[in-house]
């Protein structure tokens, strides 16, 4: 489906904090440069007919103030839309509410840098247990679909994606991504021993290899 190591190396991962009205929140950010003009990347990320071609089926009213729902996943409210430079929305799953911000930047050579920041209130116990990879690996997987779609123009079949995720390549990808989230966690100030233990638990949860 994709060159595992090439995709792992193509993504930059960052961990941080942000102060919101309700208090301090954790942030995880993934960013990747694509060989596609900004208008094409914007369309891939906002067109309801195109989003399912690389991510998940989506329904709702995709405009500021409108509600969206990803099939079998999160929903939320679109809070800001600045075409083609970015958008922001709530990310609601069950009784948990967090936020996403997507930023697009045109680069030389008709390329585009996409950065996605996920902002969430996470209690210290949960963060210590699984670290940033609990959310970050999921976004890594999403960027795989976008990379395939933008580079080839083809639709990423959901069954093909599920089969790849369960394959040796898919498990290797998640393990390597978890290691990179360990690096990002340590760079953000987490003690290496704690970050390593959290990354190992997250790897086991994603790959089904046990703890």
Which residues are covered by each model-predicted region?
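Hydrophobic pocket/interface hotspot
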Residues: 41-42, 51, 78, 87-89, ...
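Short strand-connecting beta-turns/loops that link adjacent beta-strands
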Residues: 83-84, 94-96, 107-111
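Hydrophobic/aromatic beta-strand elements that line small-molecule binding cavities or substrate pockets
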Residues: 32, 76-79, 99-106
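Short beta-edge strand/loop motif at the mouth of beta-sheet-based domains
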Residues: 21-23, 29-30, 36, 40, ...
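Hydrophobic alpha-helical segments that drive targeting, anchoring, or assembly
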Residues: 32-34, 69-70, 74-77, 90-93, ...
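Vicinal oxygen chelate
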Residues: 59, 86, 92-94, 98, ...
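Terminal "cap-and-tail" regions of soluble proteins that handle hydrophobic small molecules
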Residues: 1-21, 119-211
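Ligand-binding pocket scaffold of soluble enzyme catalytic domains
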Residues: 87, 96, 103, 115-117
């Amino acid at each position: 489906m994709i060159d595992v190591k090439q995709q792992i190396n193509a993504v930059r991962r960052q961990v941080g904090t942000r102060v919101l009205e309700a208090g301090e929140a954790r942030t995880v950010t993934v960013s990747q440069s694509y060989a596609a003009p900004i208008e094409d990347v914007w369309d891939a990320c906002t067109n309801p007919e195109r989003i399912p071609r690389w991510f998940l089926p989506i329904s709702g009213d995709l405009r500021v103030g409108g509600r969206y729902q990803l099939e079998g996943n999160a929903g939320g409210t679109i809070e800001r839309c600045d075409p083609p430079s970015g958008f922001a929305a709530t990310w609601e799953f069950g009784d948990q509410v967090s936020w996403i911000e997507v930023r697009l930047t045109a680069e030389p050579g008709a390329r585009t840098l996409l950065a996605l920041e996920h902002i969430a209130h996470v209690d210290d116990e949960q963060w210590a247990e699984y670290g940033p990879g609990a959310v970050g690996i999921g976004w890594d997987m999403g960027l795989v679909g976008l990379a395939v779609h933008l580079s080839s123009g083809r639709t990423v079949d959901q069954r093909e994606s599920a089969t790849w995720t369960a394959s040796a390549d898919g498990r290797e990808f998640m393990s390597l991504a978890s290691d990179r989230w360990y690096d990002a966690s340590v760079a953000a100030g987490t003690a290496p021993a704690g970050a390593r233990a959290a990354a190992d638990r997250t790897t086991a949860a994603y790959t089904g290899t046990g703890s």
